[in-house]
């Protein structure tokens, strides 16, 4: 119980969800951020949560564009925090190299070996209210031969 003090409501955290605000009604119509110091009644507060859903990325092209490089292009997904790109010479990705935190819709993988075939896949991610990344599904695997 707090009387005479303004209370600023803090955001809670929940794995796999984003916090959408505090409400004074169960139907989430009356949003509240603070309880004023003049308030002289009890409040029942309702936390509104939104499940984090991440759409699947679509690769538009994957090709050996320059010497020992693969240029990847993929469609932009709105509302995401970034993309994670994995590539490997093994189609099961047992020894995959992963590049995280790219936000662009194209990416150049460099320092590859000429004559090798590489397998590439991408997935998008968002961040939940705990600060953890929530990943979408990987794209279908693209196969690219490095001949340049």
What do the PLM-derived regions correspond to, one by one?
Residues 1-51:
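Secondary-structure capping and domain/repeat boundary segments
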Residues 51-79, 131-148:
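Pro/Thr/Ser/Gly-rich low-complexity, intrinsically disordered linker/stalk tracts
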Residues 40-42, 80, 115-117:
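Extracellular Ig-like/FN3 beta-sandwich strand-entry sites
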Residues 103-107:
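Short S/T/G- and acidic-enriched coil/turn segments that sit immediately N-terminal to beta-strands
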Residues 22-25, 85-90, 123-125:
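Predominantly extracellular/luminal cell-surface or secreted proteins
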Residues 79-99:
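Extracellular low-complexity, O-glycosylation-prone stalks/linkers
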Residues 109-131:
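Beta-strand-rich modules
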